[in-house]
Design a protein with these regions (language model features):
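Aromatic "clamp/platform" in nucleotide-sugar-dependent glycosyltransferases that forms part
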Residues: 254
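A charged, aromatic-enriched C-terminal amphipathic alpha-helix characteristic of glycosyltransferases
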Residues: 44-45, 317-374
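Membrane-proximal helix-turn-helix segments that form the acceptor-binding/catalytic region
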Residues: 53, 91-112, 219-221
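A short, active-site helix/loop in glycosyltransferases that binds the activated sugar's phosphate group
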Residues: 104-137, 147
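Conserved donor-binding/catalytic core segment of Leloir-type glycosyltransferases
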Residues: 111, 149, 153-186, 194-195, ...
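Short hydrophobic beta-strand element within catalytic cores of glycosyltransferases
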Residues: 271-274, 284, 291-292
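Nucleotide-activated donor-binding/catalytic signature segment of Leloir-type glycosyltransferases, i.e.
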Residues: 198-200, 207-234
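Short alpha-helical donor nucleotide-sugar binding micro-motif in glycosyltransferases
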Residues: 233, 241-246
Length: 378
């Protein structure tokens, strides 16, 4: 372990929101956030590394996320699933060069954001010639959030059931499930209102989705139901207000590495309805602090149909529709079960908030990251 530095350090970091969840919210060091060059916009095959714009200022350390920074400055790097990000290129010289950087002296730490991502990393590099070097640098640290000092508003179970779905990638994150749930509730006479915040990105190259545009032609019309309110986007403070007044937050996702909206919702006492995939089962416990819906996953915890070569076929579309139906039916059954047991529902909200306070508090993360910066540079 390196000796810790005692002076304030100059840290260079990216600007995007995943880094915000995986960094100190407040630091005794001087952190400069700058946009990096998005190499994936040039070619998706080279998204595994990044370059920060040239600057005359010298930095002690780069705190990167997902993409390995080019240059001479030492770096720490966090990651959400695969590192290096070089999908299907694991046998290439390019992948070996990126891995060599992780094993080299510039890399001062590799931080997985979940057991899910740590597991994938170890599997990816199990046969690497430098496995020992990179495993020695590997550790796990969950994302963090500044937990709002708000009392539980505990919406009345006798009024309309209020659910919230937030996700730009509409189909991937489970927006179709939310729409179908609203339809099933109305058909069953259950008074349910679902607020959807989504830019409605779906299909195309999104790796979980049916690829053909024709598949989605009816979904926009189905958002016009009387028990659905749709916003293309909202400021974050308004989303937080929605969480506080909701009975559940929906994330019946087909592909999420972590699900940051899940910790934002539960920080506001709102339990989750989510799928058992990615890192979600690490902090959502079924019938304890939320509802977990089963999804067929592989050994890594990813949906077995992710990145299917058949996404543009009618067969894939039928399978996707069947999964939407199954998840929506199960969600409705589970939610209605809590209507008849208010004490059990209140316990769910209490445990949801307690989980966030225990696992994701920013105060603990601030100290962790500041100490890691000092150890990396010292």
């Amino acid at each position: 372990m390196r000796k810790a530095s005692t002076r304030p350090l100059r840290i260079l970091a990216p600007t995007r929101y995943p880094w915000r969840f995986n960094s100190p919210r407040h630091s005794r060091h001087a952190i400069t956030n700058q946009p990096f060059l998005p190499m994936n916009k040039i070619d998706e095959r080279i998204e595994g590394f990044t370059i920060f714009p040239p600057t005359l200022r010298r930095y002690d350390l780069v705190h990167a996320f997902n993409r390995i920074p080019v240059g001479r400055t030492p770096y720490l790097i966090g990651f959400e699933s695969h590192l290096p990000r070089a999908f299907s290129l694991e046998s290439t010289a390019y992948f070996r060069a990126l891995t060599k950087s992780l094993a080299g002296k510039r890399c001062r730490g590799i931080v997985a954001i979940s057991r899910y991502s740590e597991r994938i990393f170890r599997k990816t590099h199990a046969d690497s010639a430098v496995a020992g070097e990179i495993y020695e640098k590997l550790e796990m640290r969950y994302p963090n959030i500044e937990i709002p000092a708000v009392e539980d508003q505990a919406p009345d179970l006798n009024g309309p059931l209020q659910l919230v779905f937030v996700g730009h990638h509409f189909a991937r994150k489970g927006g179709c499930v939310a729409v179908r749930l609203a339809e099933l509730a109305q058909e069953a006479g259950v008074d349910m209102r679902i607020t959807i915040v989504s830019g409605l990105a779906m299909g195309g190259d999104i790796w979980t989705d049916p690829a053909r545009d024709e598949y989605y032609e009816t979904w926009a019309d189905r958002l016009e139901r009387g028990n659905i309110t749709h916003h293309r986007s909202l400021p974050n403070d308004q989303v937080q207000t929605l969480f506080r007044g909701a009975h559940f937050c929906l994330l019946p996702t087909f592909g999420d590495t972590f699900g940051y909206s899940a910790i934002e919702a539960t920080a506001n006492h709102c339990p989750m309805i989510a799928t058992r995939q990615g890192a979600l089962p690490e902090f959502i416990e079924d019938d304890s602090n939320g509802i977990l819906l089963d999804l067929p996953v592989d050994g890594d915890g990813d949906w077995i149909h992710s990145s299917s070569p058949d996404r543009d076929t009618p067969g894939f579309e039928r399978m996707f529709t069947d999964e939407i139906e199954r998840l929506a039916e199960t969600a409705l059954t589970r939610v209605v079960g809590y209507l008849n047991n208010p004490a059990r529902y209140r316990a769910l909200r209490i445990e949801a908030r307690r989980t966030v306070e225990t696992m994701f508090a920013a105060s603990d993360a601030n100290e962790f990251w500041d100490r890691r910066y000092e150890e990396a540079v010292g």
